[in-house]
Design a protein with these regions (language model features):
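ATP-dependent helicase/translocase motor core
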Residues: 1-218
Length: 218
């Protein structure tokens, strides 16, 4: 992980003395190989509430793991206690040390979510006060935010859709982009980890699902 990145190790595994160690198995393109399907079903997605990340007992509200490897964190806020996603963003910037292994860029969790019942924002790179969060919302009346949800919270799509096993594994396998922008000298190359916005993700997943169900057409 230190030599490459968390996303690279999750996707490609690593080798020890020429022995390949796979860290995750992703949905096979074809259902004709039952062994690949068995491997895919063996993936373990877990959620840890109040996950401690240092010796002082500090914790993050939620830690999502894939086969024991951290892939996402989330800070949850409730307006009933006079807090919202902005307080979660402030918490990430001021109280989450970007040098900590869980929060370190490339080394720790792939994405960090600031969540309240109305909005979701996310970032892939914690840089203390310089951290930039982007909306991960559906949109509301052609504007920002999320539409009303008669069956629950406006942000319930995050755990009811995005974090569901098949979708979450698809995102980790195919939708997170590690970009390197060459610089001179190479030691100063700029790197970023791109996590899709909600509408980008929804559009591609819908197209992929339709193609799998109906074929590519003629």
């Amino acid at each position: 992980i230190e030599e490459t990145s968390m996303i690279n190790v999750i996707r490609n595994g690593f080798s020890i003395y020429d022995i390949q160690i796979d860290c995750a198995f992703f949905n096979p393109v074809s259902s004709k190989n039952p062994e690949l399907e068995k491997q895919y079903q063996k993936n373990i997605l877990s959620v840890i509430r109040q996950a401690r990340f240092d010796d002082q007992g500090h914790s993050v509200d939620m830690l999502l793991c894939l086969n024991g490897l951290p892939v996402a964190t989330a800070e949850l806020k409730n307006p009933a206690t006079d807090q919202d996603y902005k307080n979660a963003i402030k918490q990430y910037k001021e109280d989450r040390d970007s040098r900590n292994p869980l929060f370190r860029f490339k080394r720790g969790a792939l994405v960090h979510f600031a969540v309240d019942p109305f909005q979701v924002h996310m970032t892939t790179k914690l840089q203390d006060d310089a951290t930039v969060f982007l909306p991960f919302n559906k949109g509301r009346d052609e504007g920002s935010g999320n539409p009303d949800n008669p069956n629950g919270y406006r942000t319930s799509y995050l755990w009811e859709q995005i974090w569901q096993k098949e979708t979450w594994l698809e995102i980790i396998a195919n939708f997170i982009d590690h970009q390197i922008i060459p610089q001179k000298p190479p030691a100063e190359d700029k790197e970023s980890l791109i996590f899709p916005r909600y509408h980008q993700l929804e559009a591609v997943l819908n197209l992929t699902s339709a193609t799998r169900q109906n074929g590519i057409g003629t």
